[in-house]
Amino acid sequence: MGIGNSQPNSQEAQLCTLPEKAEQPTDDNTCQQNNVVPATVSEPDQASPAIQDAETQVESIVDKRKNKKGKTEYLVRWKGYDSEDDTWEPEQHLVNCEEYIHDFNRRHNERQKEGSLARASRASPSNARKQISRSTHSTLSKTNSKALVVGKDHESKSSQLLAASQKFRKNPAPSLANRKNMDLAKSGIKILVPKSPVKGRTSVDGFQGESPEKLDPVDQGAEDTVAPEVTAEKPTGALLGPGAERARMGSRPRIHPLVPQVSGPVTAAMATGLAVNGKGTSPFMDALAANGTVTIQTSVTGVTAGKRKFIDDRRDQPFDKRLRFSVRQTESAYRYRDIVVRKQDGFTHILLSTKSSENNSLNPEVMKEVQSALSTAAADDSKLVLLSAVGSVFCCGLDFIYFIRRLTDDRKRESTKMADAIRNFVNTFIQFKKPIIVAVNGPAIGLGASILPLCDVVWANEKAWFQTPYTTFGQSPDGCSTVMFPKIMGGASANEMLFSGRKLTAQEACGKGLVSQVFWPGTFTQEVMVRIKELASCNPVVLEESKALVRCNMKMELEQANERECEVLKKIWGSAQGMDSMLKYLQRKIDEF
């Protein structure tokens, strides 16, 4: 690209000079190729006759920039020339090329919008509000392109708008306090934030809990932080408010810590000494009545870590914290305290995530919530139910801490209440007409393992294991295990599990028929969801009738077995020997802890 060797004698000759490789035109239909207007031009703001006819020679506008004086220049692609001959032309030289300028500005804005959408799709939840500044910048750029009019006065206005846009883009993101005061409706950003079911609870580090000293990682997140799956969920069915749902399941809002801590250590004499006092209770029961309970690892040997820890111990595990937070935030149809219910396409997903007990153990409150969720799933359009758990433990059976705490008042009455709760809980599984699929992600102990044969399909993680150490607990079997275990694995293996508490690995449980299939831990969730969606695509009538045919001869037998087991449990728990065995078990847990 070069300039002719002869010096032009007029302004018109200078503006119409073409590249050397092209033949010198005889008319004045071309524009200059120099990057700047020659110094010999006396009136730079007045376009020459050749430039006024430049529309017939301009092919397209390729780019634009600001020169040192702050004026806009456009990179022009000339007809009949390639990209090497593109020239930067001042805006005032393109008076008759407004169509090309508007077309370039339109394409430029579309590219900016596409880039913003691509960045927004890759952004994390914490970066959602950064789209506010991008959206505002895009709005200013759009206004700038519309306000661009050829002329000196309009050029100065466009320069001011572009400068303001660049200044806004360079500013750092607003602080968290300022973000909350911004009007998101004006910026075009729509953020769906689910509200917490319990109001008036404090928020520390983005989580709501009972107190800053012991903060539960599973509690609801702050309302200004949203997981990516929130906008993807579409709630179906009737939405129940916090008060109505709480009244329906018989629970009350939790304001104070549920489990007070004993200030001093619990000695062996407190647990083993069963000499009753004037009230008919042991010193250990007096301590429980006075202080509430003690911090005890409630799972059997083999569960090395509970699902809940102090938040300081979880600082180095951000992924697990996000997972728990995400599960709590994406519940779409119903809200509970100890479980999470998600209404999916064709099925209902129930996750154990207990707040009132350790390691997803079962107490009457948890059982009532599971029964309520199953009743709702039985009445809506769900084809099946998926039962799983949050954390590394599936279920640790009965919550003995909850039970012993209430035995101090009236042993016989509390034993009856606990037995009735188990009876109703197990009968709900027996009488449920739709298929129940269980995804066992970790250890299943006691009642958590006994209910598995009452379900239809059981998929297990490779790391899961199964144990029913009823003699260690000081109680008799429950959950219809006295009938279903011998049917599934034979009398010898069933007795070994029920009497001596043999622990089965996932592969052993699959070989004995307790588990349908075992998956690798890394792909467990994906494998389960693929198969669940396949089942959910089937005809619901076929699924329900198929289960009825399989279970028709067992329903009455299971209900009678459940009744017998609960009567025996009531008898054992109401006796002094039963309480003695339970206290010894808890003492061993204290020593192990």
UniProtKB/Swiss-Prot annotation:
Pfam family of the protein (one): Chromo
Induction and repression of expression: Down-regulated upon neuronal activity in the hippocampus. Up-regulated after social defeat stress.
Any GO BP annotation: negative regulation of peptidyl-lysine crotonylation
Positions carrying N6-methyllysine: K130
A cellular-component GO term for this protein: nucleus
Keywords: Acyltransferase, Chromosome, Differentiation, Lyase, Methylation, Nucleus, Phosphoprotein, Repressor, Spermatogenesis, Transcription, Transcription regulation, Transferase
Residue stretches of biased makeup (Polar residues): 1-14, 133-146
CDD domains: CD_CDY (cd18634), crotonase-like (cd06558)
Domain description: The chromo domain recognizes and binds histone H3K9me3, histone H3K27me2 and histone H3K27me3. The acetyl-CoA-binding domain mediates crotonyl-coA hydratase activity. The acetyl-CoA-binding domain is required for recruitment to sites of DNA double strand breaks and for binding to poly (ADP ribose) moieties.
Descriptive protein name: Chromodomain Y-like protein
Native source species: Mus musculus (Mouse)
Gene: Cdyl
